[in-house]
Amino acid sequence: MSGVIVVGSQWGDEGKGKIVDFFAEHADAVVRYQGGNNAGHTIWHGDTKFELSALPSGIVTKGQLAILGNGVVINPEALLAEIKEVESQGVTVENLIISNRAHVIMPYHIALDKASETASNNRIGTTKKGIGPAYTDKISRVGIRVADLIDPEIFGKLLKEYLPFKNAQLTKLYGEEALDYNEIYDKYVEYGRQLAPYVTDTSYLLGQQMKENKRVVFEGAQGVMLDVDHGTYPFVTSSNPTAGGVMNGAGVGPKQIQDVVGVIKAYTSRVGSGPFPTELFNDTADHIREIGHEYGVVTKRPRRIGWLDAVALRHAVQVSGLTKLAINSLDVLSGLKEVKIATSYTYKGEEIHHFPASDTWFQGLDVNFETLPGWDEDITDVTKFDELPINAQNYLKRISELLEVDLLSFAVGPKPEQTHLLRPVWE
C-alpha cells in the first residue's frame, strides 16, 4: 500500500493544502480527485503564498507529479490562467498531468449556473462557476471530456450537437442571450492545444506508480459535509470529497490506500447556505472570523463560524474511514475564556449522536455542548505538543478521544513551519 488520502472533514476550508504538502515532501505524486475551480486552497512554499483553485497543491513541489484526476471538472481558461500565475511566481509546471477522462466546464455551464442561482427561490450558495451543470452533463452522458477537447474535429461535432439545447435553456427558460458556436469553438480549440501536452490516461499512470510502490497523495477539495451523498443535502457540492471519491475520481482501488487523514480546524466554518448546528452569531464568532481570516479564497465571502461539532466529525470519521487527524488553526482560539465542543444533539426530546439526513430536523435541533477552559497565551511560536498551554493540550486530547482517531498533527498558524507532527507522515 502506498496511497494516502487527505480529506477535508468539515465544510471545506480546513487547511488541507499544507497537510498535503507535508506528505508531498516525500511523495512521488499528488492527485486531485474531484471538484473544480470552485474550491480554493491556500498553501505556503517557503515564504511564498499560493492561492490555488484549479491546480493541485503538489504543483509547487519539485519532483512530484501533480495530477488532475478523471473526477475533476476542468475550466480550461481558469486552469491556464492559474498556470500563468504560478509561473510568474517562479513555479514550473512540467510536472502537471491531466486526465483525458476529466470533464470540461463549458461557457454554457457557467451561464446556466448563474441564471439558475439568480432565478431560484431556494439558493444553495453556489459559486456560479459551472461546477454543478458540468457534473450534471457528466451524469446525463452529454459532457465533453478532455480527450474530446484536444481533438478539434470531435470537439466541434459535440459542441454542435449540445449547444442548441443549452441555448434553448438559456433563452427560453431564463431569458438570457444565446452563446455563439464559433466563438466557443475557436477559444476552446486553442485551450485544448495549450493543454494537450499535459494530457494522458492518469488511471493507468497511477496504476504503474503504485505497482512500483511509489508514494501517492490524494487531495480532496471541499469537505465531507459538502459531499453530494453524505453531506447536508441539498446544500452540498456536486461530487464526492469523501475518501470513497478517490476510487472513482482517480481510478485506483481501495487496497492501494494506506491511510486516510482527516483535516479539521479547531472550530468550524462554512461558506454559503445550509445547516450549521453549532453556528455562532456573537462576538466570539467575530473574534474567530477576524483572527482566523475567515473569508473564502475564491468567493471572498465571510465564512460562517461555529464551535467544533463532534457529531458532524464522527459522521466524517465513519463515511471516510479516517485513520489520523490533523487539527489546524488552534492559535485562533487563544484569548477565549472557554471553548466548546458539540457532543450530541437533542431532537424532539431525544438525544441523538448521529448527523441527521433531513434538512427539516435542523430547524428543531438543540445542540449539547461540552465546555472546556480556554487559554490566553500566544501559541504561534510553539513547536512541540508539550509546549502548549495545558488547556490547549487537553482540548486536542478531548477531540481525539471523542472521535476515536489518533492525532497526526496540530497547527498554530498558517505557515508550514507552524504545523507540528506527533508521528511520521509516512509509516
UniProtKB/Swiss-Prot annotation:
Binds 1 Mg(2+) ion per subunit. Its main location: cytoplasm. InterPro entries: Adenylosuccin_syn_GTP-bd (IPR018220), Adenylosuccin_syn_Lys_AS (IPR033128), Adenylosuccinate_synth_dom1 (IPR042109), Adenylosuccinate_synth_dom2 (IPR042110), Adenylosuccinate_synth_dom3 (IPR042111), Adenylosuccinate_synthetase (IPR001114), P-loop_NTPase (IPR027417). It is found in: Cytoplasm. GO terms for cellular component: cytoplasm. One of its GO terms (molecular function) is adenylosuccinate synthase activity. SMART domains: Adenylsucc_synt (SM00788). One of its GO terms (biological process) is IMP metabolic process. Belongs to the adenylosuccinate synthetase family. This is Adenylosuccinate synthetase. It comes from Leuconostoc mesenteroides subsp. mesenteroides (strain ATCC 8293 / DSM 20343 / BCRC 11652 / CCM 1803 / JCM 6124 / NCDO 523 / NBRC 100496 / NCIMB 8023 / NCTC 12954 / NRRL B-1118 / 37Y). The lineage of its organism: Bacteria, Bacillati, Bacillota, Bacilli, Lactobacillales.
